[in-house]
């Protein structure tokens, strides 16, 4: 008698792959076909830059020194102190390293732990639309429901305002996840927009989960401002989430951090201690070296991304019925393709099938993203040059 698989829990029924993972499955299928054109990917948020040498050296030194035992699950003291130093230095925020900082295995787990600590079964979580789709599964795993906040394209950028937040609110809303710089659209929320968010959260007693992972990658006079620094009253109802993946090209290191009021951080610690535990000890040593060490590498990376951004905007300029939305931050640019009168997913598929370039269709990020394409410049050099050539050719062919 053949053994059958054990029954699976219903809590997984609402989970689905992220847009990037779903497209990767299509890419693998395409590449398995005989005679398929090799593809160039302008899809993923995976920097092609290397982790700076002094950070790598801190890790290897920790390994040589035998720093391979279980870590402090709250975060090793040097890392928590480096996080507190960084937040005061860069964001003007003071947190107690002992009670208000938590180290995590990447920012995504920090968001999951925050949701587990903040929302009950059936609670609603607000997400600005277009939505970074990796937020959706942690909300569902925590028993929550997603409520989108409609954004609008205004002045060449996506924006949200207090009216949109109010329109999305209901008595079941418990939290808002805010991402600035905003993946996928590249908007850096300004002081006025953040003040509106703060007023809304305070008026409606909504907790703020502030995802600031792209904070170091901003352009053209659009500096990152943490919502917690804009409105001091927001601090007691907010948790700041960040990681080292983008700022220091450390995606594979899987290390992030959270900062917030001590009771919330303690609750998040309980989630972490019973699941992922903390990042490896030697990884934490490298992270502390990154945050507390020289920051020249951050400036150099930002300058490199700025040059790539200009390359994207220049190469895709002047295509009839296509308009680029220049990003304020991050390493994604949105192409407004509403003038082509085709669904964004159809355009994406044509670009891959007929022109050998992979991007993400805006509709993958919610109804607010329909009519756009997300173009990544996390990779540069020949990959970016060839990809942009193919993208220009493919978009022109859709006319």
Task: Put a short name on every predicted segment.
Residues 268-273, 291-313, 344:
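Structural signature of PLP-dependent enzymes
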Residues 166-167, 341-343, 350-359, 365-399:
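PLP-dependent enzyme catalytic core of the Aspartate aminotransferase-like
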Residues 2-106, 113, 290-293, 398-399:
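N-terminal small-domain helix-loop-helix segment of the aminotransferase-like
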Residues 230-267, 279:
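Active-site PLP attachment segment
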């Amino acid at each position: 008698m053949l053994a059958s698989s054990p029954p699976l829990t219903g809590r997984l029924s609402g989970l689905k792959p992220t847009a990037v993972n779903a497209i990767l499955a299509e890419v693998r299928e395409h590449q398995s076909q005989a005679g398929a054109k090799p593809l160039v990917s302008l899809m993923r948020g995976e920097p092609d830059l290397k982790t700076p040498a002094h950070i790598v050296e801190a890790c290897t030194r920790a390994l040589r020194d035998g720093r391979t035992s279980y870590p402090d699950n709250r975060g090793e003291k040097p890392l928590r102190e480096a996080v507190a130093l960084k937040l005061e230095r860069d964001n003007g925020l003071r947190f107690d390293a002992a009670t208000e900082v938590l180290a995590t295995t990447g920012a995504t787990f920090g968001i999951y732990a925050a949701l587990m600590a903040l929302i009950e079964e059936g609670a609603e979580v607000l997400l600005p639309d277009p939505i970074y789709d990796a937020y959706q599964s942690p909300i569902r795993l925590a028993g929550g429901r997603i409520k989108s906040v409609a954004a609008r394209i205004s002045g060449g950028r996506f924006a949200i305002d207090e009216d949109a937040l109010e329109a999305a609110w209901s008595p079941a809303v418990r939290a808002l996840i805010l991402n600035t710089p905003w993946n996928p659209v590249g908007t850096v929320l300004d002081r006025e927009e953040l003040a509106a968010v703060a007023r809304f959260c305070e008026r409606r007693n909504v907790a703020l989960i502030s995802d600031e992972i792209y904070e170091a990658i901003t352009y053209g006079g659009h500096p990152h401002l943490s919502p917690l620094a804009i409105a001091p009253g927001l601090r007691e109802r907010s948790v700041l989430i960040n990681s080292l993946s983008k700022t220091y090209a450390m995606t594979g290191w899987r290390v992030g951090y959270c900062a917030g009021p001590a009771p919330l951080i303690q609750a998040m610690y309980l989630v972490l201690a019973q699941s992922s535990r903390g990042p490896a000890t030697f990884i934490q040593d490298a992270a502390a070296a990154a945050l507390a060490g020289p920051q020249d590498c951050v400036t150099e990376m930002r300058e490199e991304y700025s040059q790539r951004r200009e390359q994207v905007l220049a190469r895709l300029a002047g295509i009839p019925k296509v308009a680029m939305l220049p990003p304020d931050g991050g390493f994604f640019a949105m192409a407004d393709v509403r003038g082509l009168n085709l669904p964004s997913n159809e355009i994406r598929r044509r670009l891959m099938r007929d022109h050998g370039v992979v991007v993400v269709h805006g509709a993958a990020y919610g109804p607010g993203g329909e009519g756009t394409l997300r173009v990544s410049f996390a990779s540069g050099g020949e990959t970016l040059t060839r990809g942009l050539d193919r993208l220009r050719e493919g978009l022109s062919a859709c006319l």
